[in-house]
Regions:
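A short hydrophobic beta-strand segment most commonly corresponding to one strand
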Residues: 136-149
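Conserved metal-binding segment of the jelly-roll/cupin
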Residues: 114-134
Length: 149
């Protein structure tokens, strides 16, 4: 009897456990439609947001022109190239002439790599990075998450 009661209590508590939150899903068509729509207001670099919080960001990013060099202290990034090719520069020093807009920043002394469809890049927290020399449009999945210390 005690075993039956313990099993019954276990089943009742399992039945009361809330279900996990539903997953986030975007179809291929939704991603490309969102990129097309966001390109209207930001043609050089635009995104199809998948899910963004204070602790992580998941976006499909599309670049048609190089943007300025950047670093994200405290956040690690993974980029999976979906289409296009270009040069990704990492490391080195960010150079921005005094008075120049942030979008004009470049990297001096970094490592340059050609990236193309299928490539995956891990960018450590705070690492400087810059996509330059794009050969047409570069599209990639960006997963940025808070570094655990």
């Amino acid at each position: 009897v005690r075993t039956a009661i313990a099993v019954l209590i276990g089943l009742l508590s399992a039945a009361q456990t809330p279900a996990p939150a539903p997953s986030t899903y975007l179809s291929d068509g939704e991603v490309w439609a969102t990129l097309k729509e966001t390109a209207k207001t930001a043609p050089d670099m635009h995104t199809a947001p998948v899910k963004n919080t204070d602790h992580y960001r998941i976006n499909v990013v599309q670049r048609t022109k190089p943007q300025g060099a950047i670093a994200h202290p405290g956040f690690i990034e993974v980029h999976h190239i979906i289409e296009g090719t270009g040069t990704l520069v990492t490391g080195g020093s960010i150079i921005r002439p005094e008075g120049a807009p942030a979008g004009s920043a470049t990297i001096d002394g970094g490592v340059s790599r050609r990236v193309a469809k299928g490539d995956v890049v891990l960018i450590p927290a705070g690492a400087r990075h810059w996509y330059k020399d794009l050969e047409g449009t570069l599209t990639y999945l960006e997963v940025r998450f808070e570094e655990v210390k």
